[in-house]
């Protein structure tokens, strides 16, 4: 990964700043995690501007977050001083620098901005960092059915595009798109409990462009 300059620049310009938690991450976490367990440890990959932090803190879990953007992590440490030792700026595709293991690791559309080999490497790290029967929840991993898969510049990885000139991926560097077989390969060491594909067509106003992504719940065997 070696965190993209595009994302750090976006954070510096106060772009890609989300103030509200992602509803699907909340619903999948509540539905598929045993949150009543004491001393429940959660790690969020690509925590960004921290929109999901209030949700996890409300559950009285021990929260940790890692993001490649030093700018945004420094802002979060000022916003959440009690978490300053739990927030880390670094490349989570090559290192997850926390001691101990986690009950839950979540990612909302962060890993899906990397090349295949980096994602595979990160999933190996995730597997090692999860407790037995611990779960990984991935939300909005972009699908090859997304209309933008036809756009952008090709790379050496057939599933990864970049240099998007318009749309939601403009100036965001690499974007990874997956199909079912590709995801099954990614999670071959896990037990996949849920694999949902979300495809959205806007009818009012009518648009021919569709959004498509995957939601994944995978358990460490």
Predicted regions and their residues:
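Class I (Rossmann-like) S-adenosyl-L-methionine-dependent methyltransferase catalytic domain
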Residues: 1-40, 45-97, 118-121, 135-221
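A short glycine-rich, Lys/Arg-flanked "PGG" loop and its adjoining helix->strand segment in the class I
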Residues: 120-132
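Short catalytic micro-motifs in class I SAM-dependent methyltransferases
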Residues: 109-110
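A conserved beta-strand element that flanks and buttresses the S-adenosyl-L-methionine
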Residues: 106
